[in-house]
Every structure is written in C-alpha cells, then in structure tokens.
C-alpha cells in the first residue's frame, strides 16, 4: 500500500509529466502552423529546441539578424527573442497591421514587461487604461503646449545654469546622465508643476524606475511564467522595483491629500493647478474609470523619459563634427525667435532643427520594430502570410533604411527632410518630425502610434534651443560612438563624455 508521501510524489510526477507533454504538444502545433515562415537564425535542431544560442544572437545583433531574415523572405521571418519566438513582418505590412483586428497591444505589453506583477503596474497602465491615457494626452497635454513652452524653458534654463554651469572654460560632462536629469526636470515640470520639478528625490525616482524595472524584467524572464507569481515575492530585483514605487507613493500621498482637502473646502488656499493630476482626475471621472495617480505619473516616465534622453544624446553625437550644421541651426533659431518671440508658433518654424531631429531618429530609432502585438485569432495576411492565434508579431522598421526610399540611407544628412519637403506639398506634409508614414515609423504607425509626439517634439526643441544658443560642445578627439544593441532596442552611447563651455547667446530665452 502506498504511503501518503508516495501518493503525493506520484501525483506530482503525473502533473509535471502532463505539463511537459502539454507544452510539447503546443510547441509542435504552433511550429506546424507557422512552418512556412522561415527562421532568421541558422540553427541546428537542438539549438532550435534549447533556445539559448538564438536568444543571445537576438540580444546582441538583431539588426543583422533582421537582414538575414528579410533575405530569406521579404514578407516575414521568425526570430527567437528572450521572451519567446516572434514573427517579424516586412515594413510594407505597417498599413495592414495598424489596427487591432485580431491583435492585442495591451496583452503583449503586459506579457513582455510583466505588468501583472505587483510593482510593475506602470508598464501596463497605458494598455489597461488606454482611453484614459489617450484622452489625457491628446485633449489635455497637447492643449497645454503653448503654456508649457514658457514653463519648460524656465526649468531648462535653471537646470543648465546649475549643472552645466556658466563657465566659459571647456569642461567635461557625462552627456547621457546630464540629459536624463534635464529631461526629467522638464517632464516633471510639465506634468506636475514646479513643486515636484524641484524635488530632486522625485526626479531621481522617476529616472530610476524604468532602468530598475527593465532590469528586473530581464532578470525574471528565465523563470517559467507559471512560477512568476511566486518568484517575484523573493527576487531582489522585483523587490527593488516595488521599493521605488513605494517611495514614490510616500512623496505623492501628502500632495494628493492636500488636493483633496482643498477641494472639500477644508483648506481655503489650494495648490490645485492645471497639472496632470487634474487631467487624470477629471478625465477618469468623465469616463467612470478608477486609477492609481502615482502609477499614472510613473507611466509618463516609462513612456518617454529614457527614449527622449536617448534621442537627444544621439542628436548631439550626430552633430559632433557638423560645425556648419550647428551654425545654421543657431542662425535659424536666432532669426525665428527675433521675429516671432518665444512661443509655440516660433518652435513650429524651426524646420532645420526638425530635420536634424528626424534624421537622427531615422538613422537610429530606439526600437527597430513597431506595432508589437499578440495575435488573438488566426490571421491571414496578404502574400499568403498566416499568423496563428497566440503568436507574437511585430513590423520591421527597415523601410527607414531602404535605398529605394531614402538616398544613401546609411549616410547622415541633416537637411534630408528639408529637401524632401521641397519635392511638393504632399512631401512637405509628411516631412515634419511628428509626421508618420509607412516610410517613417519612429513614433510607430496606426492606431497605437505615439499620441504624445507633439509634446515630445516641443520638449526636445526647447532643450535643444537652450543648448545650441548657450553652449559650444565637442567630443574628445578620435571619439567613436559606442552604442549598444539590446534585442529590438538600439541604445545610444550612454557612456559618452562631452566637452562644453558657455557661450554668449544671441537672443534670450525665458528663464
């Protein structure tokens, strides 16, 4: 007769065996359905089953892997990522994949970034509260841009004076770290006003959350998904993410309490103003949706802070030996501000600056794919491409480097989009920094393209205007950028040092 322990062991063995057989059957079914789409990796059978070699190749060299995949099939190829196999469609599928029919962005993001784990909510907030986020950005944030042009200029000026200094002697700064602090200050001032914009700890936590959070996601990925609800309680990196969120709540709670008291009439003097706290509160009430105010604010940091910093850093690196371009950009800026003053209209007329920004984004987008989704029902696409339910899919951004679309696509040309605008009214319409086409997908494409790109554009112009007018900059002799490829992400040289010195600006900006 079997003992109780023997019975438990036998049941456990049956459960494990059943789980393994079920997973094997699912693996076989999936690969049978998707067999027509080639694998970009050149792997033997064992390396296809045990995916470590493939995921390492994906992590360090997706750009080359993408070239190999598209050479095998221009329509679609498969790649082994560190969170599962994914189908990458050619860039010409952007139009076909711009909607949500049979596709889910929110579910994909939650799975990729583990947004269902406690403490990781800022990674899934936008997907779980899509209407709330979209309305806040398009109806409230974008309408505040005229006011923010002045307010952010003041914050940028203050940050530069204290951190880049007013010394006219050449001195070195860690470029990425300095720009991160600058972007964080400008962003927090836009969303939460001067009180938190001058709170250094809040700024630090906003900058840290994405870095620590993404690090935790990568650390948890090797674990089987069914164990994550248990593992995250003990994993030190997951606990570090929760600690940051907890400290953010501690900073935010007294502010929220004062706002509530002011609205109830307990406190006559109210600090309530036109900030993102108001926007979320009012929009959420109008659509009948509950939300976490602290998570909502950190979501902005996750969505834009690091990508904007990366882009600004890359722009300055791209301009390192372009003294004539820098001089022309300064001249344009002086002419526009002298004529228009400092306002949203003036910023919209900085065409060379826009071309510079768009060209750096084209050359090095922070993400080499767009429209990442989970397929929620079997999909039949054009050219006989079949995507089975449950598969991961994305669209390649390769058209931004296609020589049939862009002349000398691997060469940086600061004037590229100015020249493109001169080709005719239609070209001019789609040559602006925030314009989106299937050939220019730096902000995504379709229903889930970045709704805050007008804000990003203005914030970057404010920052670049102050830097160009107030500072000379150069990089060490012989400097070669050392960017990092990390899967789909293309990251700028975060270790770059830049030499700067104060210059006498030709026109004064607010601040």
UniProtKB/Swiss-Prot annotation:
Binding site for heme: 450
EC number: 1.-.-.-
Main location: membrane
Cell compartment(s), UniProt: Membrane
Record Pfam families: p450
GO biological process, one term: secondary metabolic process
A GO MF label: heme binding
Membrane topology of this protein: Single-pass membrane protein
Top-level class of the enzyme under EC nomenclature: oxidoreductase
Gene3D superfamilies the UniProt entry points to: Cytochrome P450
Biological or metabolic pathway of the protein: Mycotoxin biosynthesis
Residues glycosylated per entry: 64, 163, 343
Cofactor: heme
Keywords associated with the record: Glycoprotein, Heme, Iron, Membrane, Metal-binding, Monooxygenase, Oxidoreductase, Transmembrane, Transmembrane helix
Record GO cellular component, one term: membrane
Sequence intervals crossing the membrane: 7-29
Superkingdom of the organism of origin: Eukaryota
Function: Cytochrome P450 monooxygenase; part of the 2 gene clusters that mediate the biosynthesis of fusicoccins, diterpene glucosides that display phytohormone-like activity and function as potent activators of plasma membrane H(+)-ATPases in plants by modifying 14-3-3 proteins and cause the plant disease constriction canker.
Identification of the protein by name: Fusicocca-1,10(14)-diene-8beta,16-diol C-9 hydroxylase
Gene: PaP450-3
């Amino acid at each position: 007769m079997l003992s109780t322990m023997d019975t438990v062991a036998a049941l456990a063995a049956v459960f494990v065996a059943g789980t393994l057989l079920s997973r094997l059957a699912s693996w076989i079914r999936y690969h049978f359905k998707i067999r027509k789409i080639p694998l970009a990796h050149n792997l033997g059978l064992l390396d296809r089953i045990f995916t470590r070699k493939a995921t390492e190749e994906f992590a360090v060299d997706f750009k080359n892997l993408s070239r190999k995949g598209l050479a095998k099939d221009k329509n679609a190829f498969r790649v082994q990522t560190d969170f599962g196999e994914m189908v990458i469609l050619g860039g010409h599928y952007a139009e076909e994949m711009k909607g949500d029919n049979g596709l889910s962005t929110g579910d994909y993001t939650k799975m990729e970034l583990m947004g269902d784990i406690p403490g990781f909510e800022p990674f899934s907030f936008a997907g779980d509260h899509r209407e709330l986020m979209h309305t806040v950005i398009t109806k409230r944030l974008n309408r505040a841009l005229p006011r923010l042009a002045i307010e952010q200029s003041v914050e940028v000026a203050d940050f530069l004076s204290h951190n880049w200094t007013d010394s006219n002697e050449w001195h070195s700064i860690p470029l990425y770290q300095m720009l991160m602090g600058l972007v964080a200050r400008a962003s927090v001032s836009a969303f939460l006003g001067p009180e938190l914009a001058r709170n250094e700890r809040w700024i630090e936590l906003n900058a840290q959350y994405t870095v620590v959070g993404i690090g935790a996601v990568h650390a948890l990925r090797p674990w089987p998904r069914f164990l994550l609800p248990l593992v995250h309680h003990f994993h030190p990196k997951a606990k570090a993410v929760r600690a940051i969120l907890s400290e953010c709540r501690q900073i935010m709670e007294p502010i929220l309490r004062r706002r509530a008291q002011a609205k109830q009439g307990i406190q006559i003097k109210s600090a309530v103003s036109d900030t993102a706290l108001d926007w979320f509160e009012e929009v959420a009430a109008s659509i009948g949706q509950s939300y976490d105010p602290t998570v909502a604010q950190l979501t902005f940091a996750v969505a834009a802070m690091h990508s904007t910093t990366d882009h600004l850093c890359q722009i300055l690196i791209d301009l390192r030996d372009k003294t004539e371009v820098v001089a022309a950009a300064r001249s344009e800026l002086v002419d526009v501000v002298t004529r228009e003053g400092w306002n949203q209209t003036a910023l919209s007329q900085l065409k060379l600056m826009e071309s510079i920004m768009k060209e750096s984004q084209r050359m090095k987008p922070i993400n080499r794919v767009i429209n990442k989704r989970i397929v929620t029902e079997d999909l039949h696409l054009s050219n006989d491409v079949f995507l089975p339910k449950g598969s991961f899919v994305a669209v390649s951004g390769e058209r931004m480097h296609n020589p049939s679309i862009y002349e000398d696509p691997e060469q940086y040309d600061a004037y590229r989009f100015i020249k493109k605008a001169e080709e005719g009214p239609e070209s001019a319409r789609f040559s602006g920094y925030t314009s989106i086409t299937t050939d220019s997908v730096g902000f995504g494409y379709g229903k889930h393209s970045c709704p805050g790109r007008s804000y990003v554009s203005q914030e970057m112009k404010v920052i670049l205007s102050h830097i160009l007018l107030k500072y000379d900059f150069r990089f060490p002799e012989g400097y070669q950028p050392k960017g990092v490829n990390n899967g789909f992400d293309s990251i700028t040289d975060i270790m770059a040092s830049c030499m700067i010195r104060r210059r006498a600006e030709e026109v004064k900006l607010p601040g």
